[in-house]
Amino acid sequence: MTGATNGHLREITRRTALGALGAGIIGATVASWPRLSGTDIPGRGDNSLSIAIMGTAADAAARQRAIDAFTRLHPEIKVKVQAIQAVDWKDFFTKILTMVAAGTPPDVVYVATEGAQLFAEKLAHPLDEYVRRDAADMREFFEDVHPSLVEAFMYKGSLYQLPMDWNAANMYYNTTAFAQAGLDRPADDWTHLDFRNSLAAMRKARPSDFTPYYWTNRLFGGVVPWLYANDTSFLKETRSSGGEWLWDGFYANDPSRSLRSGGYQWLEPNANDDRVFESFDYLRGLVKDGLGVRPEEGGGSSLVGLFASNRIGTTPAGGYWVQGLHEAGMGENDFDVQFFPRWKTQRHQFGTAGYAIMKTAKDKDAAWEWIKFSSSREAMELIFPNPITTPARRSMVNEKLYAGKGPANWKVFYDTLDRFPTTGPIPAPPQQAAVETALMKNVSLAVSGDERQLKQALASMQRDLELALRRQS
């Protein structure tokens, strides 16, 4: 297994990125991006392993302890981390593709579910041979990580990333708002109708300056968790064959072994499904009756402050929210979390992230050593000392991580996978950027009018998704 990359592969990968940019898959124009050169990437121009993450300089600095620990183990490998500021994952992937097109890609990229198949299809190098070679070293990792997270990074039978962190769309609730409405903690198996009744009770107790349910218009935590709970999605979900080498090698005795595959596929639109209409109609009713907001596009930057000031009753989010609520002044008993409400199923949605080795990496063997080290408990405890996300390792989701910060029922986070093993990743094919645009474009219209408008919006979404899925990734 060599780390060398020949010029032919480098040119193919560069052409791939240029094609993706030219096709508009990212939804922006090259002219609007800052010019990038080799000097923009730490490590480019020397033998350092260059690693790109989404974030700020402070995020890069936060990884220094992990880099120091890695250097002690591998003094022959120099590592430099570049944090790339971006509005969201789509923006981050845009900037990575720009670097590839400029001929100055990083060696390793931290990629979330939203971009996993885009990278696997064209940009990333599979990990199969490395994982097989170092199976003895990797066994402890897989024993500590739920197979659903691993399967999210399988693509056409090969593994492209190891999950480092993840978050499910659970339901956060403000305990003060619940108490004011005379509500107890919801049951683990509460339904979408129970949820609506809870919202109505909070609205009655707080008729003004209060939102019972706040949600955003994006792939994670928007309409998709409701679609999953209703046993559907806006894209038809199928699975690739393959992957037996991984599942039989590391998860042979796992109770969910029979569910595993060579990876998810989303090849066709499904916005015209009756259950998609039913799910949107439910959300339309919440908006119409003043129980929920019209969804805000993006991540909802004002959400933490509103929730912390007791102006929001419930919202879908994952373990990444805990530290932010703590820093906003919420006590450990001021909020709690519960499983997402049950409908026809109680399948949840999650997103995960991990490092991908670029096909153009200068030294793939060195890149693998970084990924292997980063998957260790030592490294993950250095990178995730606070509940800014949910660690992929089950053993790290423990009382110590949430002590003094909450929530009281923190076990919900990992129990989401253990109790609902069909819980699945964000629907993100290689054309994810265009697909997300097609979804977001039609959501607000679908939930803000009458039934006729809803049907028109879903018909528009179906057409937009058909076009999006035809695009070359």
Tell me what each language-model feature is:
Residues T2-G3, G7-R10, L18, G43, ...:
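Conserved C-terminal helix/tail region of periplasmic/extracytoplasmic solute-binding proteins
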Residues R10, T16-L36:
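N-terminal export signals
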Residues D46-S50, T56-G115, L193:
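Early extracytoplasmic/lumenal segment of secretory-pathway proteins
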Residues R72-L73, K78-K80, A181, Y264, ...:
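Extracytoplasmic/periplasmic substrate-recognition and gating elements
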Residues I84-K95, W190-D194, R294-A308:
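Short helix-initiation/N-cap motifs at beta->coil->alpha
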Residues T113-A168, D334-Q338, G404-K405:
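Hinge/lid segment of periplasmic solute-binding proteins
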Residues L199-A200, T238-E296, F340:
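Glycine-centered hinge/linker elements that transmit conformational signals in sensory
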Residues G331-Q338, P385-K441, L445:
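Long, aromatic- and glycine/proline-rich binding clefts that accommodate carbohydrate-like moieties
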